[in-house]
Amino acid sequence: EIFAIESVNETAAGLGLEVDQMAAKKFRDLHKKLVLSDNAIIDVGNGSLEQFLSGMVQIDESHEEIDFFVIPVESDTKGQKETIKTVMALAEIGIEPQKIRIVFNKVESDVADEFPHVLNYVKKEKNAIADVKAAIFENELFDALGAKGITIGALLADETDYKALIKNNPDASAKERSHWGDMHGLKALARSVNRNLDSVFSTLFK
């Protein structure tokens, strides 16, 4: 199950996955659902984090229902500072360092060069796990998937040979041929991105 806590980000719902939208102030309802669920992902919007953590503090040991707190960070200075604040907030309410995992998002080439503030902070405070191998590299696929409303999984499962369609249908309309060309390219991108995501997952939860 995926729970989106007032997330203003492009959540899984925008990629065709079923998402349970919830308000941050309804933490007790979320806690009950977590207790009843075997597997769940909670996507907390930045603007809802403080209220979410407040609700967690009010229900004793509720954080025990959450195995990991995964924090994605982008390289801009503001994003890094917000991530540091989030790690500090989690540490202050007693979340163990090994449960706080940082994912470096939209990496251009080198995590150490692009995320110095986060890396230096975690190295000093030792209150989270920040492995430079947990890096999702910048790729145009994510925007394209959002626009088409499909997931990487659905794209990879699509067995259509779009290259063959282009080759074998020279009289098809320009619109059809353009669509087939797009899909062929997206499938190639998806294979590369999927390898990257599998590697990040293995790094985070090894």
Q: What residue spans do the PLM features occupy?
A:
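Glycine-rich, highly charged phosphate/nucleotide-binding loops
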Residues: 20-31, 51-56
